[in-house]
């Protein structure tokens, strides 16, 4: 998932 590094 490309957005796996985005903050949550």
From Swiss-Prot:
Listed GO biological process terms: defense response; vasoconstriction
Keywords, alphabetical: Amphibian defense peptide, Bradykinin receptor impairing toxin, G-protein coupled receptor impairing toxin, Secreted, Toxin, Vasoactive, Vasoconstrictor
Keyword ATP-binding: no
Domain of life: Eukaryota
Tissues where the protein occurs: Expressed by the skin glands.
Record localization: Secreted
Cell division as UniProt keyword: no
Single GO molecular function: toxin activity
One cellular-component annotation, GO: extracellular region
Similarity comment: family membership: Belongs to the bradykinin-related peptide family.
Its job: Vasoconstrictor. May target bradykinin receptors (BDKRB).
Protein name: Bradykinin-related peptide Pnor-5
Source species: Pithecopus nordestinus
Lineage per the UniProt record: Eukaryota, Metazoa, Chordata, Craniata, Vertebrata
């Amino acid at each position: 998932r490309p957005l796996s590094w985005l903050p949550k």
